[in-house]
Amino acid sequence: MNALTAVQNNAVDSGQDYSGFTLTPSAQSPRLLELTFTEQTTKQFLEQVAEWPVQALEYKSFLRFRVAKILDDLCANQLQPLLLKTLLNRAEGALLINAVGVDDVKQADEMVKLATAVAHLIGRSNFDAMSGQYYARFVVKNVDNSDSYLRQPHRVMELHNDGTYVEEITDYVLMMKIDEQNMQGGNSLLLHLDDWEHLDNYFRHPLARRPMRFAAPPSKNVSKDVFHPVFDVDQQGRPVMRYIDQFVQPKDFEEGVWLSELSDAIETSKGILSVPVPVGKFLLINNLFWLHGRDRFTPHPDLRRELMRQRGYFAYASNHYQTHQ
């Protein structure tokens, strides 16, 4: 598991003005910040990246960093350091991001470009085997016959970390709402590890550090099992997690009972946040100390939600962001 790199300073300065965007605490929690790009910044960004279709970003990976630089330059180079400090800050580590005027499925390509730019200011998004690209778009409908809970609308998708069944480092997760029709419910669910009242009990359990087998269903296009413990620590010895109830494969009675109790303790936590994410907005979270999931939808025959995800690793100049602080 990748060790979390901590920073000393809080990313939020309540009195600071930013160029090209605003930053405020969310209504749900001071740990979750809302970042909004201004109408002018959004317009200029989309104009400057218009020459590159999404396919160009798929084929030429360096262009993902090119569009990231364009966005940061439009924000007077204040955006990249703020994103990194927020996501690496244990007290926060989560952002709800949107751009004024980008809020319709007809702008889906523009949404992908914007999310790609933000993600590549903090690192690089990994190859997504489910889609064959560095991002994945998928649809939730009223009826689902898939082999995981990802697209099933009428049940809660339990809280989990991403990247549990792959060998690549998964430091961050980005989840964007591209479209929504005939939709009620289905809020994003978030739980910060430090707000989980049962953390100490499970983190100190003898099974917390035992390597366990994680195996994905066929739809994930990953055939190799991986082995790792559910819990680890960051560079300061604080708990981090790499867990999903659907894909962990207990080898015996002891592991199975413990994992079942762990799942119940997570799902019944009083620290869970319910966060509405309108079309065009996206969540960006530190995957090592935030768990995420989704609440159930109200059934409707024409229910439709389209999502886009990216997940990857942090990468930055070490002389700008101190470790062990």
Curated annotation (Swiss-Prot):
Keywords: Dioxygenase, Iron, Metal-binding, Oxidoreductase. One of its GO terms (biological process) is L-lysine catabolic process. Disruption phenotype: Cells lacking this gene accumulate higher levels of glutarate than wild-type during carbon starvation and entry into the stationary phase. It holds the Pfam family CsiD. The keyword Secreted does not apply. It catalyses: glutarate + 2-oxoglutarate + O2 = (S)-2-hydroxyglutarate + succinate + CO2. Fe cation binds at H160, D162, H292. Its cofactor is Fe(2+). It comes from the Bacteria. Its EC number is 1.14.11.64. GO terms for cellular component: protein-containing complex. It is an enzyme of class 1 (oxidoreductase). Binds 1 Fe(2+) ion per subunit. Induction: Expression is induced by RpoS during carbon starvation and at stationary phase. Is also regulated by cAMP-CRP and Lrp, which play the roles of a nearly essential activator and of a positive modulator, respectively. Repressed by CsiR. Makes part of the operon glaH-lhgD-gabDTP. Homotetramer. Acts as an alpha-ketoglutarate-dependent dioxygenase catalyzing hydroxylation of glutarate (GA) to L-2-hydroxyglutarate (L2HG) in the stationary phase of E.coli. Functions in a L-lysine degradation pathway that proceeds via cadaverine, glutarate and L-2-hydroxyglutarate. Other dicarboxylic acids (oxalate, malonate, succinate, adipate, and pimelate) are not substrates for this enzyme. PANTHER family: GAMMA-BUTYROBETAINE HYDROXYLASE-RELATED, TAUD_TFDA-LIKE DOMAIN-CONTAINING PROTEIN. Belongs to the glutarate hydroxylase family. NCBIfam families: PRK02963.1. This is Glutarate 2-hydroxylase. It comes from Escherichia coli (strain K12). The gene is glaH.
